[in-house]
Amino acid sequence: MKTLILSASIGLAGCALALFSRQRSVAQLNTLFDWLGRGEASLVEHFLSGLGVVLLSIFLVVLHARMSTRQAWPKAWLRAGWFVALRSKVFRATRPIYIVHWSAVIATVYVLASCQWELGQAQAGRAFQTLQLSMDIAGSATACLFLMLLMRADYRRARQSRSLVLGR
């Protein structure tokens, strides 16, 4: 749970900083982003938004899976059985060892949406902004690597329990 809180706070901070910089509401933040982006503050904004979107999406996926543990209303036995089976599949898919897989899927969707946006901008007569797309990719990849580092202990624990069960 600490991992989820950490990823949610980093994701929220990244999205908030990118939004504040985009709105030009904090002069010191704009100066810092201009310095970090070497005159292109939008590059840092795209990096932070790529990082924040992936981490917040992972937090929402896992939070939804954790919150849906009970049936909210009585159901017929067939629907209740279907709900229990679906819930067990969702829980298996949102175990900590699968969070990195989920982040890779979400990062891929985000990068494809960014690429589609840049292609749409290029078709509208504006230039295709390769640097901004590459910063979206870098932010998403950084989020995946960050989650992979945070989940390393869970991977190790799962590998050890699997080897005990399989008799290796």
Language-model region placement:
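Bulky hydrophobic segments
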Residues: 1-168
